[in-house]
């Protein structure tokens, strides 16, 4: 977390937490979608 704050000194903890949450949810959604496509294709 300290490394992120060093890279983005203007970002406070709330913005960084929201951004990380959005990225994590997007990756989770994409992996879930690909898993469903694999199941549907079989």
From Swiss-Prot:
Residues annotated as transmembrane: 19-37
Record text on subunit structure and interactions: The 4 large subunits of the cytochrome b6-f complex are cytochrome b6, subunit IV (17 kDa polypeptide, PetD), cytochrome f and the Rieske protein, while the 4 small subunits are PetG, PetL, PetM and PetN. The complex functions as a dimer.
Protein name, per record: Cytochrome b6-f complex subunit 7
Keywords: Chloroplast, Electron transport, Membrane, Photosynthesis, Plastid, Thylakoid, Transmembrane, Transmembrane helix, Transport
Protein family (similarity comment): Belongs to the PetM family.
Membrane topology: Single-pass membrane protein
Originating gene: petM
Lineage of producing organism: Eukaryota, Sar, Stramenopiles, Ochrophyta, Bacillariophyta
Source organism superkingdom: Eukaryota
Coiled-coil residue spans: none
Organism: Thalassiosira pseudonana (Marine diatom)
InterPro entries registered for this protein in UniProt: PetM_cyt_b6/f_cplx_su7 (IPR012595)
């Amino acid at each position: 977390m300290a490394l992120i704050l060093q890279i983005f000194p203007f970002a406070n903890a709330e913005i960084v937490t929201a951004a990380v949450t959005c990225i994590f949810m997007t990756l989770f959604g994409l992996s879930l979608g690909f898993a469903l496509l694999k199941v549907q294709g079989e």
